[in-house]
Amino acid sequence: MGKEKTHINIVVIGHVDSGKSTTTGHLIYKCGGIDKRTIEKFEKEAAEMGKGSFKYAWVLDKLKAERERGITIDISLWKFETSKYYVTIIDAPGHRDFIKNMITGTSQADCAVLIVAAGVGEFEAGISKNGQTREHALLAYTLGVKQLIVGVNKMDSTEPPYSQKRYEEIVKEVSTYIKKIGYNPDTVAFVPISGWNGDNMLEPSSNMPWFKGWKVTRKDGNASGTTLLEALDCILPPTRPTDKPLRLPLQDVYKIGGIGTVPVGRVETGVLKPGMVVTFAPVNVTTEVKSVEMHHEALSEALPGDNVGFNVKNVSVKDVRRGNVAGDSKNDPPMEAAGFTAQVIILNHPGQISAGYAPVLDCHTAHIACKFAELKEKIDRRSGKKLEDGPKFLKSGDAAIVDMIPGKPMCVESFSDYPPLGRFAVRDMRQTVAVGVIKAVDKKAGGAGKVTKSAQKAQKAK
Protein backbone atom coordinates (compact mmCIF):
# COMPACT_ATOMS: atom_id res chain seq x y z
CA MET A 1 0.00 0.00 0.00
CA GLY A 2 2.79 2.43 0.80
CA LYS A 3 2.11 5.59 2.75
CA GLU A 4 -1.43 6.86 2.69
CA LYS A 5 -1.99 10.09 0.76
CA THR A 6 -2.45 13.29 2.72
CA HIS A 7 -6.06 14.39 3.23
CA ILE A 8 -6.97 17.93 2.25
CA ASN A 9 -10.26 19.81 2.36
CA ILE A 10 -11.49 22.19 -0.30
CA VAL A 11 -14.50 24.43 -0.51
CA VAL A 12 -15.98 25.31 -3.91
CA ILE A 13 -17.30 28.87 -4.13
CA GLY A 14 -18.76 31.16 -6.76
CA HIS A 15 -21.99 32.66 -8.08
CA VAL A 16 -25.11 30.55 -8.24
CA ASP A 17 -24.96 29.70 -11.96
CA SER A 18 -21.21 29.55 -12.41
CA GLY A 19 -21.25 25.77 -12.83
CA LYS A 20 -19.88 24.80 -9.42
CA SER A 21 -22.00 21.67 -9.23
CA THR A 22 -21.12 20.51 -12.71
CA THR A 23 -17.41 21.11 -12.15
CA THR A 24 -17.44 19.43 -8.74
CA GLY A 25 -19.61 16.61 -10.05
CA HIS A 26 -17.17 16.06 -12.91
CA LEU A 27 -14.22 15.67 -10.52
CA ILE A 28 -16.10 13.33 -8.18
CA TYR A 29 -17.40 11.39 -11.16
CA LYS A 30 -14.04 10.94 -12.85
CA CYS A 31 -11.66 10.61 -9.87
CA GLY A 32 -13.94 9.97 -7.03
CA GLY A 33 -15.64 7.76 -4.58
CA ILE A 34 -18.83 7.12 -6.50
CA ASP A 35 -19.01 3.53 -7.60
CA LYS A 36 -20.03 2.40 -11.07
CA ARG A 37 -23.37 1.09 -9.85
CA THR A 38 -24.47 4.37 -8.33
CA ILE A 39 -23.43 6.24 -11.47
CA GLU A 40 -25.37 3.86 -13.67
CA LYS A 41 -28.40 4.29 -11.42
CA PHE A 42 -28.10 8.09 -11.61
CA GLU A 43 -27.66 7.97 -15.39
CA LYS A 44 -30.75 5.84 -15.77
CA GLU A 45 -32.81 8.20 -13.60
CA ALA A 46 -31.46 11.21 -15.47
CA ALA A 47 -32.45 9.66 -18.79
CA GLU A 48 -35.93 8.85 -17.50
CA MET A 49 -36.38 12.43 -16.43
CA GLY A 50 -35.33 13.67 -19.84
CA LYS A 51 -32.01 14.86 -18.45
CA GLY A 52 -30.50 12.31 -20.77
CA SER A 53 -27.46 14.41 -21.54
CA PHE A 54 -26.63 13.52 -17.91
CA LYS A 55 -25.19 16.66 -16.50
CA TYR A 56 -22.54 15.96 -13.87
CA ALA A 57 -24.46 18.34 -11.68
CA TRP A 58 -27.09 15.62 -11.42
CA VAL A 59 -24.65 13.62 -9.29
CA LEU A 60 -24.33 16.53 -6.95
CA ASP A 61 -28.04 17.31 -6.90
CA LYS A 62 -28.73 13.76 -5.82
CA LEU A 63 -26.12 13.97 -3.07
CA LYS A 64 -27.34 17.40 -1.97
CA ALA A 65 -30.96 16.36 -1.83
CA GLU A 66 -30.01 13.44 0.37
CA ARG A 67 -27.89 15.66 2.56
CA GLU A 68 -30.70 18.22 2.91
CA ARG A 69 -33.22 15.56 3.82
CA GLY A 70 -30.90 14.81 6.68
CA ILE A 71 -29.86 11.43 5.36
CA THR A 72 -26.24 11.34 6.33
CA ILE A 73 -24.88 10.25 3.03
CA ASP A 74 -21.78 8.24 2.68
CA ILE A 75 -19.18 10.95 2.91
CA SER A 76 -16.89 9.12 0.46
CA LEU A 77 -19.20 10.46 -2.23
CA TRP A 78 -17.77 13.89 -1.62
CA LYS A 79 -14.20 12.71 -2.06
CA PHE A 80 -11.89 12.34 -5.01
CA GLU A 81 -8.19 11.69 -5.49
CA THR A 82 -5.35 13.54 -7.15
CA SER A 83 -1.94 11.95 -7.55
CA LYS A 84 -0.86 13.42 -4.18
CA TYR A 85 -4.01 13.94 -2.14
CA TYR A 86 -7.31 12.59 -0.98
CA VAL A 87 -9.55 15.61 -1.47
CA THR A 88 -12.77 16.11 0.47
CA ILE A 89 -15.23 18.75 -0.66
CA ILE A 90 -16.47 20.04 2.65
CA ASP A 91 -19.31 22.01 1.24
CA ALA A 92 -20.50 23.62 -1.88
CA PRO A 93 -22.61 26.74 -1.66
CA GLY A 94 -26.19 26.43 -2.66
CA HIS A 95 -26.51 24.23 0.36
CA ARG A 96 -28.80 26.20 2.70
CA ASP A 97 -26.42 26.59 5.60
CA PHE A 98 -23.34 27.03 3.48
CA ILE A 99 -22.18 30.32 4.98
CA LYS A 100 -22.83 29.13 8.51
CA ASN A 101 -21.04 25.85 7.80
CA MET A 102 -18.12 27.62 6.23
CA ILE A 103 -17.68 29.74 9.32
CA THR A 104 -18.37 27.34 12.12
CA GLY A 105 -16.05 25.20 10.02
CA THR A 106 -17.28 21.64 10.33
CA SER A 107 -13.78 21.42 9.04
CA GLN A 108 -11.47 24.12 7.88
CA ALA A 109 -10.83 24.31 4.15
CA ASP A 110 -7.19 24.19 3.07
CA CYS A 111 -8.01 25.80 -0.26
CA ALA A 112 -10.95 27.53 -1.93
CA VAL A 113 -11.76 26.84 -5.57
CA LEU A 114 -13.53 29.86 -7.04
CA ILE A 115 -15.57 29.10 -10.15
CA VAL A 116 -16.47 32.02 -12.40
CA ALA A 117 -18.54 31.66 -15.58
CA ALA A 118 -17.03 33.05 -18.78
CA GLY A 119 -20.32 33.11 -20.71
CA VAL A 120 -21.56 36.42 -22.13
CA GLY A 121 -23.05 38.48 -19.28
CA GLU A 122 -22.61 35.66 -16.76
CA PHE A 123 -19.27 36.76 -15.39
CA GLU A 124 -20.56 40.31 -14.99
CA ALA A 125 -23.61 39.12 -13.04
CA GLY A 126 -21.52 37.07 -10.64
CA ILE A 127 -19.05 39.81 -9.90
CA SER A 128 -21.57 42.67 -9.72
CA LYS A 129 -22.18 44.39 -6.39
CA ASN A 130 -24.76 41.86 -5.29
CA GLY A 131 -23.24 38.81 -6.96
CA GLN A 132 -22.08 36.08 -4.62
CA THR A 133 -18.60 35.82 -6.13
CA ARG A 134 -17.24 38.69 -4.05
CA GLU A 135 -18.98 37.69 -0.84
CA HIS A 136 -17.76 34.09 -1.02
CA ALA A 137 -14.19 35.10 -1.78
CA LEU A 138 -14.18 37.68 1.01
CA LEU A 139 -15.59 35.11 3.42
CA ALA A 140 -13.00 32.53 2.48
CA TYR A 141 -10.20 35.04 3.06
CA THR A 142 -11.63 36.38 6.34
CA LEU A 143 -11.98 32.85 7.67
CA GLY A 144 -8.37 32.01 7.04
CA VAL A 145 -8.56 30.07 3.77
CA LYS A 146 -5.34 31.46 2.36
CA GLN A 147 -4.98 29.33 -0.80
CA LEU A 148 -7.11 29.98 -3.84
CA ILE A 149 -7.57 28.43 -7.29
CA VAL A 150 -9.73 30.12 -9.92
CA GLY A 151 -11.53 28.04 -12.54
CA VAL A 152 -12.77 30.16 -15.44
CA ASN A 153 -15.66 27.91 -16.42
CA LYS A 154 -17.97 27.54 -19.42
CA MET A 155 -15.19 28.43 -21.86
CA ASP A 156 -17.26 26.53 -24.44
CA SER A 157 -19.95 29.22 -24.26
CA THR A 158 -17.86 32.34 -24.86
CA GLU A 159 -18.30 34.39 -28.04
CA PRO A 160 -16.58 32.88 -30.10
CA PRO A 161 -16.19 29.61 -28.13
CA TYR A 162 -12.90 29.16 -26.23
CA SER A 163 -12.01 32.83 -26.63
CA GLN A 164 -8.55 33.75 -25.38
CA LYS A 165 -9.50 37.43 -25.27
CA ARG A 166 -12.48 36.76 -23.00
CA TYR A 167 -10.37 34.55 -20.72
CA GLU A 168 -7.67 37.20 -20.35
CA GLU A 169 -10.24 39.90 -19.64
CA ILE A 170 -11.72 37.78 -16.83
CA VAL A 171 -8.33 36.89 -15.33
CA LYS A 172 -7.45 40.57 -15.21
CA GLU A 173 -10.70 41.55 -13.52
CA VAL A 174 -10.69 38.69 -11.00
CA SER A 175 -7.04 39.38 -10.15
CA THR A 176 -7.92 42.98 -9.34
CA TYR A 177 -10.68 42.14 -6.93
CA ILE A 178 -9.09 39.17 -5.17
CA LYS A 179 -6.11 41.45 -4.60
CA LYS A 180 -8.42 43.97 -2.92
CA ILE A 181 -9.64 41.23 -0.62
CA GLY A 182 -6.10 40.25 0.36
CA TYR A 183 -5.07 37.37 -1.94
CA ASN A 184 -1.88 37.74 -3.96
CA PRO A 185 -2.81 36.85 -7.58
CA ASP A 186 0.75 35.56 -8.23
CA THR A 187 0.03 32.69 -5.84
CA VAL A 188 -3.29 31.82 -7.51
CA ALA A 189 -3.63 29.31 -10.36
CA PHE A 190 -6.09 30.48 -13.05
CA VAL A 191 -7.39 27.67 -15.28
CA PRO A 192 -9.76 28.02 -18.26
CA ILE A 193 -12.13 25.03 -18.07
CA SER A 194 -15.40 23.54 -19.15
CA GLY A 195 -16.80 21.50 -16.27
CA TRP A 196 -19.39 20.21 -18.69
CA ASN A 197 -17.20 19.22 -21.64
CA GLY A 198 -14.19 18.40 -19.49
CA ASP A 199 -11.74 20.88 -21.06
CA ASN A 200 -8.63 21.28 -18.85
CA MET A 201 -10.33 19.40 -16.03
CA LEU A 202 -8.17 16.25 -16.02
CA GLU A 203 -6.49 16.49 -19.41
CA PRO A 204 -5.17 19.47 -21.37
CA SER A 205 -7.79 20.76 -23.81
CA SER A 206 -7.21 20.68 -27.55
CA ASN A 207 -9.80 23.48 -27.83
CA MET A 208 -7.48 26.04 -26.24
CA PRO A 209 -4.08 25.67 -27.89
CA TRP A 210 -3.39 29.28 -26.89
CA PHE A 211 -3.39 28.35 -23.18
CA LYS A 212 0.22 27.77 -22.18
CA GLY A 213 -0.63 26.63 -18.65
CA TRP A 214 -0.88 28.26 -15.24
CA LYS A 215 2.01 29.29 -12.98
CA VAL A 216 2.14 30.20 -9.33
CA THR A 217 4.98 31.88 -7.48
CA ARG A 218 5.17 31.43 -3.72
CA LYS A 219 7.84 31.24 -1.09
CA ASP A 220 6.98 27.61 -0.28
CA GLY A 221 7.77 26.51 -3.82
CA ASN A 222 6.61 27.53 -7.27
CA ALA A 223 4.33 25.35 -9.34
CA SER A 224 2.92 25.12 -12.83
CA GLY A 225 0.58 22.92 -14.82
CA THR A 226 -2.30 22.95 -17.27
CA THR A 227 -5.35 21.34 -15.70
CA LEU A 228 -7.58 21.95 -12.70
CA LEU A 229 -6.61 18.56 -11.29
CA GLU A 230 -2.92 19.52 -11.43
CA ALA A 231 -3.72 22.80 -9.69
CA LEU A 232 -5.40 20.86 -6.88
CA ASP A 233 -2.33 18.65 -6.72
CA CYS A 234 -0.18 21.73 -6.07
CA ILE A 235 -2.09 22.90 -3.01
CA LEU A 236 0.36 23.27 -0.13
CA PRO A 237 -0.44 20.58 2.44
CA PRO A 238 -1.84 21.87 5.72
CA THR A 239 0.14 21.77 8.93
CA ARG A 240 -2.11 20.20 11.52
CA PRO A 241 -1.74 21.87 14.93
CA THR A 242 -0.63 18.89 17.05
CA ASP A 243 1.84 20.97 19.02
CA LYS A 244 -0.82 23.29 20.46
CA PRO A 245 -2.67 22.50 23.69
CA LEU A 246 -5.76 20.31 23.32
CA ARG A 247 -9.08 21.85 22.24
CA LEU A 248 -12.01 19.57 21.50
CA PRO A 249 -15.47 21.17 21.12
CA LEU A 250 -18.21 18.66 21.97
CA GLN A 251 -20.76 17.85 19.29
CA ASP A 252 -22.81 15.51 21.49
CA VAL A 253 -22.70 13.67 24.78
CA TYR A 254 -24.00 10.10 24.92
CA LYS A 255 -24.87 7.86 27.81
CA ILE A 256 -23.91 4.33 26.89
CA GLY A 257 -25.10 1.44 29.05
CA GLY A 258 -22.27 -0.43 30.72
CA ILE A 259 -19.73 2.20 29.67
CA GLY A 260 -21.01 5.50 31.00
CA THR A 261 -20.71 9.04 29.67
CA VAL A 262 -19.20 9.43 26.20
CA PRO A 263 -18.63 12.95 24.84
CA VAL A 264 -18.12 13.10 21.07
CA GLY A 265 -16.38 15.74 19.00
CA ARG A 266 -13.55 16.64 16.70
CA VAL A 267 -10.04 17.30 17.97
CA GLU A 268 -9.27 20.80 16.67
CA THR A 269 -5.81 21.26 18.19
CA GLY A 270 -3.47 19.16 20.29
CA VAL A 271 -3.67 15.47 21.14
CA LEU A 272 -6.17 13.48 23.20
CA LYS A 273 -4.95 10.31 24.93
CA PRO A 274 -6.42 7.81 27.38
CA GLY A 275 -5.25 8.58 30.92
CA MET A 276 -5.24 12.35 30.36
CA VAL A 277 -7.00 14.57 32.86
CA VAL A 278 -9.25 16.93 30.93
CA THR A 279 -11.17 20.05 31.92
CA PHE A 280 -14.48 20.94 30.26
CA ALA A 281 -15.25 24.65 29.86
CA PRO A 282 -17.33 26.68 30.55
CA VAL A 283 -18.80 24.17 33.05
CA ASN A 284 -15.42 23.79 34.77
CA VAL A 285 -15.55 20.02 35.29
CA THR A 286 -12.28 18.07 35.45
CA THR A 287 -12.02 14.32 35.00
CA GLU A 288 -9.92 11.49 33.63
CA VAL A 289 -10.24 10.13 30.09
CA LYS A 290 -10.62 6.35 30.31
CA SER A 291 -10.57 5.48 26.61
CA VAL A 292 -10.71 7.11 23.17
CA GLU A 293 -12.49 5.59 20.17
CA MET A 294 -12.87 6.36 16.50
CA HIS A 295 -15.15 4.29 14.25
CA HIS A 296 -15.55 1.77 17.10
CA GLU A 297 -11.82 1.20 17.39
CA ALA A 298 -9.77 2.09 20.45
CA LEU A 299 -7.09 4.75 19.82
CA SER A 300 -3.89 5.34 21.72
CA GLU A 301 -4.08 8.99 20.63
CA ALA A 302 -6.44 11.23 18.66
CA LEU A 303 -5.00 14.01 16.50
CA PRO A 304 -6.42 17.20 14.98
CA GLY A 305 -9.13 16.39 12.47
CA ASP A 306 -10.13 13.14 14.19
CA ASN A 307 -13.79 12.77 15.15
CA VAL A 308 -13.77 10.74 18.33
CA GLY A 309 -15.80 9.56 21.27
CA PHE A 310 -14.12 9.32 24.66
CA ASN A 311 -15.27 7.75 27.88
CA VAL A 312 -15.04 9.86 31.05
CA LYS A 313 -15.44 8.66 34.62
CA ASN A 314 -17.70 10.13 37.36
CA VAL A 315 -19.29 12.66 35.01
CA SER A 316 -23.00 12.51 34.31
CA VAL A 317 -24.65 13.44 31.03
CA LYS A 318 -26.08 16.45 32.86
CA ASP A 319 -22.61 17.83 33.63
CA VAL A 320 -21.38 18.38 30.07
CA ARG A 321 -23.13 19.20 26.81
CA ARG A 322 -22.76 20.17 23.15
CA GLY A 323 -20.82 23.42 22.81
CA ASN A 324 -18.58 22.69 25.81
CA VAL A 325 -14.86 22.45 25.09
CA ALA A 326 -12.48 19.82 26.46
CA GLY A 327 -8.79 20.59 27.05
CA ASP A 328 -5.79 19.35 29.00
CA SER A 329 -6.16 20.35 32.66
CA LYS A 330 -2.38 20.90 32.90
CA ASN A 331 -1.70 22.69 29.63
CA ASP A 332 -3.60 25.95 29.09
CA PRO A 333 -6.97 24.45 30.05
CA PRO A 334 -10.01 26.02 28.36
CA MET A 335 -11.96 28.57 30.40
CA GLU A 336 -15.26 30.38 30.34
CA ALA A 337 -15.21 33.67 28.43
CA ALA A 338 -16.59 36.61 30.42
CA GLY A 339 -16.46 38.62 27.21
CA PHE A 340 -14.42 39.01 24.05
CA THR A 341 -13.35 41.52 21.42
CA ALA A 342 -14.02 40.62 17.81
CA GLN A 343 -13.68 41.99 14.32
CA VAL A 344 -17.02 41.55 12.56
CA ILE A 345 -18.23 42.07 9.00
CA ILE A 346 -21.95 42.75 8.61
CA LEU A 347 -23.14 40.73 5.59
CA ASN A 348 -26.88 41.22 5.40
CA HIS A 349 -28.93 43.04 7.95
CA PRO A 350 -32.01 44.99 6.85
CA GLY A 351 -31.58 47.74 9.44
CA GLN A 352 -28.96 49.15 11.73
CA ILE A 353 -27.09 47.32 14.44
CA SER A 354 -26.33 49.27 17.59
CA ALA A 355 -24.95 48.46 21.04
CA GLY A 356 -27.32 46.12 22.88
CA TYR A 357 -28.09 43.97 19.82
CA ALA A 358 -28.16 40.33 20.99
CA PRO A 359 -28.30 37.77 18.17
CA VAL A 360 -27.25 34.11 18.34
CA LEU A 361 -23.59 33.27 17.73
CA ASP A 362 -22.50 29.99 16.17
CA CYS A 363 -18.90 29.41 17.21
CA HIS A 364 -17.38 25.92 16.89
CA THR A 365 -20.26 23.74 18.20
CA ALA A 366 -21.68 26.37 20.58
CA HIS A 367 -24.92 28.18 19.74
CA ILE A 368 -25.42 31.02 22.22
CA ALA A 369 -26.94 34.52 22.28
CA CYS A 370 -24.30 37.23 22.69
CA LYS A 371 -24.71 40.94 23.18
CA PHE A 372 -22.88 43.57 21.12
CA ALA A 373 -21.91 45.45 24.31
CA GLU A 374 -19.84 48.19 22.69
CA LEU A 375 -19.12 49.23 19.11
CA LYS A 376 -15.49 50.30 19.49
CA GLU A 377 -14.45 51.30 15.99
CA LYS A 378 -15.51 51.07 12.39
CA ILE A 379 -12.70 49.84 10.14
CA ASP A 380 -11.92 49.43 6.46
CA ARG A 381 -12.63 45.77 5.84
CA ARG A 382 -9.85 45.39 3.30
CA SER A 383 -6.97 47.16 5.05
CA GLY A 384 -8.19 46.96 8.65
CA LYS A 385 -7.46 50.70 9.11
CA LYS A 386 -9.66 52.62 11.53
CA LEU A 387 -12.38 54.77 9.93
CA GLU A 388 -14.17 56.08 13.04
CA ASP A 389 -14.19 55.68 16.82
CA GLY A 390 -17.31 54.58 18.69
CA PRO A 391 -19.74 54.41 15.75
CA LYS A 392 -23.41 54.77 16.76
CA PHE A 393 -24.52 51.90 14.50
CA LEU A 394 -23.41 49.41 11.85
CA LYS A 395 -25.12 48.44 8.60
CA SER A 396 -24.59 45.87 5.84
CA GLY A 397 -21.08 46.03 4.40
CA ASP A 398 -19.52 47.58 7.49
CA ALA A 399 -16.60 46.07 9.35
CA ALA A 400 -16.00 46.91 12.98
CA ILE A 401 -14.24 46.03 16.21
CA VAL A 402 -16.83 45.22 18.89
CA ASP A 403 -16.92 44.02 22.49
CA MET A 404 -19.27 41.10 23.01
CA ILE A 405 -20.74 39.50 26.12
CA PRO A 406 -22.21 35.97 26.04
CA GLY A 407 -25.75 35.64 27.42
CA LYS A 408 -24.90 32.22 28.87
CA PRO A 409 -21.53 30.74 29.80
CA MET A 410 -19.48 29.85 26.72
CA CYS A 411 -15.90 28.99 25.84
CA VAL A 412 -14.21 30.71 22.90
CA GLU A 413 -10.59 31.51 22.05
CA SER A 414 -8.78 34.15 20.03
CA PHE A 415 -8.40 33.32 16.34
CA SER A 416 -4.62 33.68 16.59
CA ASP A 417 -4.35 31.08 19.39
CA TYR A 418 -6.96 28.53 18.28
CA PRO A 419 -8.40 29.39 14.84
CA PRO A 420 -11.34 26.92 14.88
CA LEU A 421 -12.56 28.36 18.19
CA GLY A 422 -12.00 31.94 17.13
CA ARG A 423 -14.36 32.43 14.20
CA PHE A 424 -18.12 32.73 14.39
CA ALA A 425 -21.30 33.40 12.47
CA VAL A 426 -23.95 35.79 13.75
CA ARG A 427 -27.42 34.39 13.04
CA ASP A 428 -30.67 36.33 13.17
CA MET A 429 -33.91 36.20 11.18
CA ARG A 430 -32.92 32.75 9.91
CA GLN A 431 -29.89 34.00 8.08
CA THR A 432 -26.23 34.80 8.60
CA VAL A 433 -26.17 38.47 9.51
CA ALA A 434 -22.44 38.81 10.13
CA VAL A 435 -19.21 36.87 10.47
CA GLY A 436 -16.40 37.55 12.85
CA VAL A 437 -13.01 36.59 14.17
CA ILE A 438 -12.12 36.91 17.83
CA LYS A 439 -9.18 39.19 18.63
CA ALA A 440 -8.98 38.81 22.42
CA VAL A 441 -10.83 36.95 25.17
CA ASP A 442 -11.43 38.06 28.74
CA LYS A 443 -11.22 34.72 30.56
CA LYS A 444 -13.12 34.07 33.76
CA ALA A 445 -10.85 32.50 36.36
CA GLY A 446 -13.25 30.05 37.97
CA GLY A 447 -11.20 28.37 40.68
CA ALA A 448 -11.06 24.58 40.72
CA GLY A 449 -14.70 23.84 39.90
CA LYS A 450 -15.76 20.20 40.04
CA VAL A 451 -12.84 17.78 40.08
CA THR A 452 -13.95 14.15 39.99
CA LYS A 453 -12.47 11.41 42.15
CA SER A 454 -10.87 9.74 39.17
CA ALA A 455 -9.17 13.00 38.24
CA GLN A 456 -7.77 13.38 41.76
CA LYS A 457 -6.50 9.81 41.66
CA ALA A 458 -4.93 10.27 38.25
CA GLN A 459 -3.27 13.51 39.34
CA LYS A 460 -1.85 11.89 42.49
CA ALA A 461 -0.57 8.93 40.54
CA LYS A 462 1.55 11.18 38.40
Curated annotation (Swiss-Prot):
Residues of the tr-type G domain: 5-242
Modified residue annotations for 5-glutamyl glycerylphosphorylethanolamine: E301, E374
One BP term from GO: translational elongation
Region G2, annotated ranges: 70-74
Reaction equation(s) it catalyzes: GTP + H2O = GDP + phosphate + H(+)
Signal peptide boundaries: none
Entry keywords, A to Z: Cytoplasm, Elongation factor, GTP-binding, Hydrolase, Methylation, Nucleotide-binding, Phosphoprotein, Protein biosynthesis
Binding-site residues, GTP: 14-21, 153-156, 194-196
Coarse class of the protein's main subcellular location: cytoplasm
Keyword Protein biosynthesis carried by entry: yes
Source organism superkingdom: Eukaryota
InterPro entries per record: EFTu-like_2, G_TR_CS, GTP-eEF1A_C, P-loop_NTPase, T_Tr_GTP-bd_dom, TRAFAC_GTPase_members, Transl_B-barrel_sf, Transl_elong_EF1A/Init_IF2_C
Chain intervals for the UniProt region annotation (G4): 153-156
Pfam families: GTP-eEF1A_C, GTP_EFTU, GTP_EFTU_D2
N,N,N-trimethylglycine modifications at: G2
GO molecular function, one term: molecular adaptor activity
Stretches the record annotates as G1: 14-21
Compartment(s): Cytoplasm
Family in the record: Belongs to the TRAFAC class translation factor GTPase superfamily. Classic translation factor GTPase family. EF-Tu/EF-1A subfamily.
NCBIfam families registered for this protein in UniProt: EF-1_alpha, PRK12317.1
Free-text function comment from the UniProt entry: Translation elongation factor that catalyzes the GTP-dependent binding of aminoacyl-tRNA (aa-tRNA) to the A-site of ribosomes during the elongation phase of protein synthesis. Base pairing between the mRNA codon and the aa-tRNA anticodon promotes GTP hydrolysis, releasing the aa-tRNA from EEF1A1 and allowing its accommodation into the ribosome. The growing protein chain is subsequently transferred from the P-site peptidyl tRNA to the A-site aa-tRNA, extending it by one amino acid through ribosome-catalyzed peptide bond formation.
Protein known as: Elongation factor 1-alpha 1
